[in-house]
From Swiss-Prot:
The keyword Cytoplasm does not apply. It is an enzyme of class 3 (hydrolase). Belongs to the metallo-dependent hydrolases superfamily. Adenine deaminase family. GO terms for biological process: adenine catabolic process. Keywords: Hydrolase, Manganese. CDD domains: AdeC. This is Adenine deaminase. Its cofactor is Mn(2+). It catalyses: adenine + H2O + H(+) = hypoxanthine + NH4(+). Pfam families: Adenine_deam_C, Amidohydro_1. Its EC number is 3.5.4.2. The keyword Hydrolase applies.
């Protein structure tokens, strides 16, 4: 089902003129509106008032407020509050482990009417084909999915990705109606060093929206980064960092995902004064957390429960988000605005009871009417088969670096342990929560295998493995034994990628992700329950992490401080160089 992003788009001029006349007549009350929400109140994000009024809708637009209207179809919203649809300003749909169509069905009923996604997960595996898949899907979804073109594929050259996207690969998509601009520019060292390819991308998108990604970047270096035309940023993990970015003119996107949980730390800056320069995002959130907690509705509830003024958080969730990304047709309950509306039980509860997307009441019938999009990225896992011997350390020294997991953060610690050296090299120390980590190149490029150690998973036995491993999505495995690490890695090749939990050579739980090794072909309900089983299986191995698989997914991302591992080895992100074990 293809619908218009503006009421004139793709409509013959004569039809557009007629629609414009209908909107005027319905807004002026001369004709019954297509839909009228009656009996409730709406939140005016300009004044902060709760206004008792009908809301009249013609086609995909709000045409009337502050009045009484007749409607061809009237919906009683007595005792409830109408707010603008929520906008997720930065996310990777692939991290939900479902296709864009299933993501649409999963989160739109919870009030997320616009999602601004960066498809760089699938782009790292499939390149332009992956971006095209997302753009084709975005034309068919009920919610408005907008796409930022992936700016850093791969994130760095310290890992092996499936492809490399240069500026000439991105430009053919630049004028697509669903494209806003350039996605998170993760290679901030490249920006500051004026790397030629970085400069080519930045120059090509000057005047368009360029999203940022600059964890812990401060001072004059931050100034230089912003001066490149970068407007928004979602990596602030404390109020001090966020305030510096706000003071320097950036929009700060407050993030709360399944692993990166920054909302609590940033609550002090979510005020009515700052709200016009704030927005909300999830970055990476899986269907299990969406089902158990919610999506942006969860962020809103949590913020208000933590003392944030409702007006501030609702502004950040809609109108401020829309303005930050140039979507001036939405974000308010006002005439002329896109009819993206959420009927909630209360501002504090923020439980969506009715959702309208572009003037259509969201229902299973709407989802069923969508045109399907052909699958891509099958059989993308081309890793070599491995044995336990591939993961044995050759070092004679027990003094070893280890990646330190910080629960709820994707930043890691650069730790050092003195470990026992046995007949098969340096051994894990389960008493001190130090186990092995391995990254295996899976794109059929070179068969690289890198091993190291990690602290903080809590594993006492077995292994967990994934092909969701930002950003190049090689196989990443954490385990207490070399044999189980090998079994888990090999199983991922057999199921076209996904998640696996292994103990004593047996698979305890798994979830295939055959679309590029990132997304399931199943409904989100099936994915949700598979994730629940995987999480329980990981807990049975001793995992102490709330979200072990997404935590695992960021171990190999060498643009997030401090110590990471790619298929090429351990990376000291602060120095941006490889280091020995």
């Amino acid at each position: 089902m293809r619908h218009c992003d503006s009421f004139c788009e793709l409509i013959p001029m004569k039809g557009c003129e007629a629609m414009l006349e209908w909107m005027i007549d319905q807004g002026a009350g001369r004709e019954p509106a297509d839909i009228v929400l009656k009996g409730g109140r709406f939140l005016d994000l300009i004044t902060g008032e709760l206004v008792e009024s009908d809301i009249a809708i013609c086609e995909d637009r709000i045409v009337g407020t502050f009045g009484t209207y007749r409607g061809k179809h009237e919906i009683d919203v007595s005792g409830r509050i109408v707010v603008p649809g929520f906008i997720d300003t930065h996310l990777h749909i692939e991290s939900s482990q479902v296709t864009p169509h299933e993501f649409d069905r999963c989160v739109l009923p919870q009030g997320v009417t616009t999602a601004i996604c960066d498809p760089h997960e699938i782009a790292n595996v499939l390149g332009a084909e992956g971006i095209r898949f997302f753009l084709d899907s975005a034309l068919e979804t009920v919610m408005d999915i907008r796409v930022q073109l992936s700016s850093c594929v791969p994130a760095t050259h310290m890992e092996t990705s499936g492809v490399e996207l240069l500026i000439d690969d991105l430009l053919p998509f630049a004028d697509h109606p669903k494209v806003i601009g350039l996605a998170e520019f993760m290679n901030f060292p490249g920006v500051l060093a004026k790397d030629p390819e970085c400069m080519a991308k930045l120059r090509a998108f000057q005047g368009r929206h360029i999203d940022g990604h600059a964890p812990l970047l401060r001072g004059l270096d931050l100034n230089g980064y912003i001066a490149a035309g970068i407007r928004t940023e979602h990596e602030a993990t404390n109020a001090e960092e966020a305030l510096e970015k706000l003071r320097k003119g950036m929009y700060v996107l407050v993030r709360e995902g399944s692993v990166s949980k920054d909302l609590k730390a940033l609550m002090p800056i979510i005020t009515e004064r700052h709200a016009q320069f704030l927005a909300l995002c999830t970055d990476d959130r899986n269907p299990l957390d969406i089902a158990d907690q919610g999506h942006l509705d969860y962020l809103i509830r949590t913020a208000i429960a933590g003392g944030v003024e409702p007006l501030a958080i609702y502004r950040a969730a809609s109108v401020s988000a829309a303005r930050a990304f140039g979507l001036f047709d939405r974000g308010l309950v006002a005439p002329g605005q896109r009819a993206d509306l959420v009927v909630v039980d209360s501002l504090e509860g923020c439980h969506a009871e009715i959702v309208l997307s572009a003037g259509r009441v969201v229902s299973e019938a709407l989802f069923a009417a969508r045109k399907p999009v052909a699958e891509v990225g099958r059989n993308s896992v081309k890793a070599p088969r491995v044995t336990a011997s591939n993961f044995r350390s050759q070092s004679n020294s027990g003094k070893t670096r280890a990646i330190g997991i910080v629960p709820g953060k994707i930043i890691t610690q650069n730790l050092e342990f003195d470990l026992k050296v046995g007949p098969n090299g340096v051994e894990p120390d389960l008493e001190r929560d130090v186990v092995k980590v391995a990254v295996i190149e899976r794109h059929g490029k070179n068969g690289n295998i890198a091993t190291g150690f990690v602290h903080g998973f809590g594993l006492k036995a077995g292994a967990i493995a994934s092909t969701v491993s930002h950003d190049s999505h090689n196989i990443c495995v954490v385990g207490a034994s070399d044999e189980d690490i090998a079994t888990a890695a090999n199983r991922l090749g057999e199921i076209e990628g996904g998640f696996v939990v292994v103990r004593d050579g047996k698979v305890l739980a798994e979830m295939p992700l055959p679309i590029a090794g990132l997304m399931s072909t199943e409904p989100y309900e099936t994915v949700r329950e598979a994730l629940r089983k995987l999480r329980h299986a990981a807990e049975d191995l001793g995992s102490v992490l709330e979200e072990p698989f997404l935590q695992l997914a960021f171990i190999a991302l060498p643009v997030i401080p401090h110590l990471k591992i790619t298929d090429r080895g351990l990376v000291d992100v602060d120095k941006f160089e490889f280091v020995g074990n």
